């Protein structure tokens, strides 16, 4: 309620205003800007026990009337609300009724509506793309036009059928009849209807949960389904923010960072440091395009001409046209202008944050599915060239085949453990960048690509891909004005992470120059080095390295956020303590006892006790939520949920726990035991070994060993 929403707080507070405790109570409410409405005595004893507090609204004509039916008096008042507070405009959503749509009919209509292949091939890239998208949209509009309806303001109960709603109406009528008559016969009828209705609702909920969970194709979908079933999204909080407010805020946030850096001088001559070159993309066959379309996850956004799952169903009728668009784009070095638009949805970072503040939102960028299909075609060829010629940083694990956050953490952790075994202390520094993907300078990125040997239409295509991009914000049914993007790699794109990895390639040489080792995962960079415990040059070396990194960041238009950069000191032995801080400009970096690194809580003793405690808490909360709906779940559905929401957490980066004593990992084993009991709906005292055998679950210690062997293979 921090956004100025009118608020009235009233009731029997059982507080005597003439007592000292009342002063503290009034001070507390005043801190929330609540003001008390003065009245006469509200109790027959002459005290004011029934109180009214208001905020952002006025109350007049307050009247206290003794009714002689209670010790408390009746209080009436007029509540004056502002027009904005009294009337909140109804939100409207737009949907299509796709249930009645026949995909085969849509496919035939699209085939007949698209120009012939000879006519389509004569169109340039942008014209062909516009024609293709407009044809798909118009065909879908003919079958399923958009219809508007008021948005729901209450949580839905999707398992309620028309029969159950009719049954509920009869139940409520019987309840009212019994309350009115107080007749035993009416009570029996009401109780019978209540028992029958409860049983039918239980059956309907069980069937609904079972179908929803069994239809989930992967862990991510299962997690979203589980969250939506357990905690339906609440109605959006009242807010005066508009889509244009968000668009301007997101644009200015990036522009403020970019404006801090000096303007680059255009270079006329670029020297290619790579002996190999990549000047053009190879054309794709219709079979290649079909594989790209059908193998991709069917994500849909408002920019798609038709829902992606429909596009995949009718793909056979549109593949020839799509093949021309993609090959024309690759051949001409032109990225279609229609695909340069992004649709951004603001998401509140945490439910507890004030929804009236723009800085509490993060942008979620959505791109058209066909645009990402074209990006995948480029990604496959570009990444193959980079890998074959060893042009990517070997210490970059982000979005690379055979690498993950776990391999990145293993590399760093093993180095720290080996240093401790050699009686050396170590320093681990976790760098934090502000809006790193959004501030990438296109001129520097293209220069880096040239030096790697990328030229010709391939470089021209990448230049076209980066330039003239824009976005619009969708917020509560309205769309903002378009905002241009002068910097950055597209968020939510296929190529964005790869291009950012290329952009960061030269940072490694700056770090290694100071004798530091490093490892990266996308924009998360961790650098570390080991030293003798009595080395007096440690602080100077760290300061010099961070200073050069900061200079490199400035030269590459990236902002190093020193306030969020973390420093972890791992001593040579538990009894040794290093007490120092790093001063860089006006910022001071002090060592932390723990630091979160790629989702793992690391501590200065490498005991991982804090990480195990954090994992245990999150798993217990997940099990608690699963138990809430366990009566409605089958054994198979429960097992799916537990494996996706609990075991996945136990297994995340569990190779880091290899070698820890059994007492340290025991809390994780207790979680697995509890999970097995939830699957079979057994009590807490049930023997767990037979349950684990029936589930074919390895114990936690064995899972850690198995993961270690799998990664070393």
PLM regions: where:
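Short, conserved micro-motifs composed of acidic
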Residues: 41-55, 62-63, 279, 477, ...
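Surface-exposed loop/turn segments and immediately adjacent short secondary-structure elements
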Residues: 82-86, 109-112, 119-127, 132-138, ...
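Active-site palm subdomain of RNA-directed nucleic acid polymerases
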Residues: 1-7, 378-396, 419-421, 497-530
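Conserved pre-catalytic core of RNA-dependent polymerases
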Residues: 250, 279-490, 529, 640, ...
